[in-house]
UniProtKB/Swiss-Prot annotation:
Gene: tufA
Enzyme kind, highest EC tier: hydrolase
N-acetylserine modified-residue sites: 2
GO terms for biological process, alphabetical: response to antibiotic; translational elongation
Protein name: Elongation factor Tu 1
Phosphothreonine PTM positions: 383
Binding residues for GTP: 22, 24-27, 136, 139, 174-176
Result for mutant: residue 383 to E: The mutant remains preferentially in the open inactive conformation
Subunit architecture: Monomer. Heterotetramer composed of two EF-Ts.EF-Tu dimer complexes.
Renumbered residue ranges of the record's region G1: 19-26
Substitution effect: residue 317 to D: Kirromycin resistant
Amino acid sequence: MSKEKFERTKPHVNVGTIGHVDHGKTTLTAAITTVLAKTYGGAARAFDQIDNAPEEKARGITINTSHVEYDTPTRHYAHVDCPGHADYVKNMITGAAQMDGAILVVAATDGPMPQTREHILLGRQVGVPYIIVFLNKCDMVDDEELLELVEMEVRELLSQYDFPGDDTPIVRGSALKALEGDAEWEAKILELAGFLDSYIPEPERAIDKPFLLPIEDVFSISGRGTVVTGRVERGIIKVGEEVEIVGIKETQKSTCTGVEMFRKLLDEGRAGENVGVLLRGIKREEIERGQVLAKPGTIKPHTKFESEVYILSKDEGGRHTPFFKGYRPQFYFRTTDVTGTIELPEGVEMVMPGDNIKMVVTLIHPIAMDDGLRFAIREGGRTVGAGVVAKVLG
């Protein structure tokens, strides 16, 4: 029992494999679990256990994803691997699997390929903060110069999308040989694990971030004032602290005069908890669902942003027809829908169901947002797409 208890105190980090089809992402995932289990204990996962990825739903979209876990001496990792390219696109855009860092798998025999580029671009757009490169299938390349050339190409590609290409760790390995138990190549998996530990910083926990609560409901309690309810997304709210009410209308200031959960009064509400927050001097009609309560100065309302979106295919319950510029759907942020207009990239006339695309959105009301905020695209309450704010514009 004591061992189990000790494990839970390790920092938890979310990672995943990305890269071109058939470059060895799933084989590498299996090799990491196998070599680390052999070295540090834990469960090994075979290739076919990972390859048969179960379906899951995120924001109404079906995604095939495999989740594995492994440990190094200092950390616990949760790792996602997707079987198909479309699953990666959907996963990264919906944030179904938030990554603190990604392992980009590039076959040394091929070098960077179209999906290599697309996954790096997606990583940039959706805010994957760190990329480590695993140059796979190096056992099949005898030419040192060729390996150096591929490495240089990968570094240039990373730099092109604003990742620090020159400083990115690159491990030369063979996932298959490591999986087969070849000691020389197993050492490369341990080298990769070392970079996961050293290159990806420990993620900041939700509770340590500035307070934010998306408002789900508003009540008036006679003699006490106005209460808003919702789940604390991040941070802590304490009785007596100032808050801002952000989004839809002009930003207002108030003070939290009480926090309650399950009808009990508390001193504070913490990330992950469903709470009611009593606000001083705010009338019931001055506040609504879709706004957020936040620590003053930490989040601003915006109407215009660049986004990366995935449009559901017909089979996924999405649109049956393409849309064109001038399309005006609803954008669902946190707890509410806001109508918006879109601008498509230069040279793109229409967007087909099943496409992923970069678009600029202008909302009719401002919403509290930062880069990285996820949203759904809806038509009359039906989800037709998912997106992420890549860059706030105004």
